[in-house]
Amino acid sequence: MSSSNYDVKTGNFLCGFDKFPPEKETDKNRGLTEGFTEIISMAGVPGTIEIASGYYIEASLINQLIQIIGVDVFIKSYFFNLGTKFLESKLLNIIADPELAFQLFRNIEINFQIRNLKGKQSLLGNIQLLLLDYLEKRCEKLIENNKLREVNEILKIYEQMLITPEKLKIMDKNPDDYEGLVESITKFKNLQEKLSPKLVNIEAQDSVRK
């Protein structure tokens, strides 16, 4: 754990998305804590080679989530030790399924716990696939409100944050062990193709503003 503080009143140790001892499942998520701590660290040290980070996968998943619910939500949850409940509430505004949001964060935590596991595994691929469901709904809502440029920027950034087989090779991991990962990349490309006809009016919007 990269940092922590002790709450004298409650007798709990607090750190990012974690509370010790935890009272409920949403009180603990070391995967999120380490991932967001890594993002903060890399932001503070320009030139850091991100893919060399020990928590690159966790940071990448969080960066995907940031494009969906915003960085301010993470900052508040992290520094005020809110667990994952606040994050879940924001996801419910996109897809109204509490179990889906809960399971997403459980999977991120479990994926962190088994990060050194060798052999076939499907959690990482499933997480990226699920995040893309949220991304699609988020983009559709923005398009409904004619926020085309915002959607365009989100898709550009999101593509850079995807965990790909090529990145896993650089991390000395076998991409063939990560079931569902290739499918998640394909799903993102299909989403790009689906939304691209709706984004052709961005230049027209800019002309109107001028």
Describe the residue ranges of each PLM region.
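Short alpha-helix carrying the canonical HExxH Zn2+-binding catalytic motif
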Residues: 1-5
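Post-HExxH zinc-binding segment in Zn-dependent metallohydrolases
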Residues: 6, 10-69
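Pan-zinc metallopeptidase signature
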Residues: 52-207
